[in-house]
């Protein structure tokens, strides 16, 4: 099978990146030292090519009403242009089709950013719901492989870390209007070298920073100038350890079509209280929350917490969904789906290679803005 490639593929290879098959995409896992890339983001600034993710533009007078029924979170929270909202998109049974970010620009203009591996299915689902509801929304995917003919494709670079925003501003003065942005807000600016740039104060690392959406034709110039300014390229390996420390779910690992957001630590993204109806609402209300989604820290030596390991508790067995060795904490950490009745602070056991090792149950996240929140 031929892997898909982002517009930065040649640059990754020229930098000596170790490339891997990530859901059908040829992506960099690291550029030498995953640990150093991780610490660069926690302490300075790093950047990730996330152009495999897909921007989907929605337009038309009924767009808000359409999204009110499509998403589990309530887009009525979006009243200020540029405001962003994290949400799950569910099927009729309450399973997670995808988790995404929706941006509001005008009553007739919204933007979604969806995950790479689910993008084609997401677009099909959104189009089917649009047709079924008669909403008449214009749906325009902006990734190169799915963009309509004549529509310029977009690319995305995430610049993350305590010094990320300052380095973006110094490198691209056109982005200075983003100085006033609060987290989960975006602004669109015109840059003489890049063209139209969406600057979003969002990320997937637990650090401050921007996600920059630019024309695919301009992204190489963006990357090279940021690297020259001291922003360190970072791969999927560091992205995974950073998001795990930050308590951020990964679709396909921590939740999927078979998992309710209520069992994936995402109840805060679901609006069940308002009268608004949305796909999956009835199923969620009927099922409720069956399991807890909590963190684990391995206390015994001799193993690393990994996905699918069994967690043994007095209340019954649970399962790790994501696990790794945390570079920031120098401990093995994990997310786990655990039975009701397990409490933060409890000691549980994890089966690792036919051994039962002790772990402590903790509240997520583990690290935020460079500071450890657990011990």
Swiss-Prot record:
It is an enzyme of class 2 (transferase). Keywords: Aminotransferase, Transferase. It catalyses: N(6)-[(R)-S(8)-aminomethyldihydrolipoyl]-L-lysyl-[protein] + (6S)-5,6,7,8-tetrahydrofolate = N(6)-[(R)-dihydrolipoyl]-L-lysyl-[protein] + (6R)-5,10-methylene-5,6,7,8-tetrahydrofolate + NH4(+). The keyword Phosphoprotein does not apply. Pfam families: GCV_T, GCV_T_C. Its EC number is 2.1.2.10. Coiled coil: none annotated. GO terms for biological process: glycine decarboxylation via glycine cleavage system. GO terms for molecular function: aminomethyltransferase activity; transaminase activity. One of its GO terms (cellular component) is cytosol. InterPro entries: GCS_T, GCS_T_bac, GCST_C, GCV_T_N, GcvT/YgfZ/DmdA, GcvT/YgfZ_C, TrmE/GcvT_dom1. PANTHER family: AMINOMETHYLTRANSFERASE, AMINOMETHYLTRANSFERASE, MITOCHONDRIAL. Belongs to the GcvT family. The glycine cleavage system is composed of four proteins: P, T, L and H. The glycine cleavage system catalyzes the degradation of glycine. HAMAP family: GcvT. This is Aminomethyltransferase. The lineage of its organism: Bacteria, Pseudomonadati, Pseudomonadota, Betaproteobacteria, Burkholderiales.
């Amino acid at each position: 099978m031929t892997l898909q490639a982002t517009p930065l593929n040649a640059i990754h290879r020229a930098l000596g990146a170790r490339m891997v098959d990530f859901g059908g995409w040829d992506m960099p896992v690291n550029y030498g030292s995953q640990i150093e890339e991780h610490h660069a983001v926690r302490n300075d600034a790093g950047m990730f090519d996330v152009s495999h993710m897909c921007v989907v533009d929605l337009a038309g007078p009924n767009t808000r009403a359409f999204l009110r029924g499509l998403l589990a979170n309530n887009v009525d929270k979006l009243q200020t242009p540029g405001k962003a909202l994290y949400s799950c998109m569910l099927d009729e049974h309450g399973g997670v089709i995808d988790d995404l970010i929706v941006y509001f620009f005008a009553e007739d203009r919204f933007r979604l950013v969806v995950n790479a591996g689910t993008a084609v299915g997401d677009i099909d689902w959104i189009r089917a719901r649009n047709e079924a509801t008669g909403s008449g929304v214009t749906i325009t995917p902006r990734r190169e492989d799915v963009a309509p003919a004549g529509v310029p494709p977009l690319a995305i670079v995430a610049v993350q870390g305590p010094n990320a925003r300052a380095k973006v501003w110094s490198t691209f003065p056109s982005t200075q209007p983003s100085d006033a942005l609060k987290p989960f807000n975006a602004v669109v600016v015109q840059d003489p070298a890049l063209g139209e740039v969406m600057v979003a104060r969002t990320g997937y690392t637990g650090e401050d920073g921007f996600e920059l959406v630019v024309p695919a034709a301009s992204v190489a110039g963006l990357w090279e100038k940021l690297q020259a300014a001291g922003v360190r390229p970072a791969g999927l390996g560091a992205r995974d350890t950073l998001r795990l420390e930050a308590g951020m779910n990964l679709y396909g690992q921590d939740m999927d079509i078979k998992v309710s957001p209520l069992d994936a630590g995402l109840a805060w993204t679901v609006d069940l209280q308002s009268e608004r109806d949305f796909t999956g609402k009835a199923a969620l209300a009927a099922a409720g929350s069956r399991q807890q989604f909590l963190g684990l820290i391995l206390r015994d030596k001799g193993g690393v917490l990994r996905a699918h390991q069994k967690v043994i508790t007095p209340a019954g067995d649970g399962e790790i969904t994501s696990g790794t060795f945390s570079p920031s904490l120098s401990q093995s950490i994990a997310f786990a789906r655990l039975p009701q009745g397990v409490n933060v602070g409890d000691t549980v056991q994890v089966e690792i290679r036919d051994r039962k090792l002790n772990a402590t149950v903790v509240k997520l996240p583990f690290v935020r803005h460079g500071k450890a929140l657990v011990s």
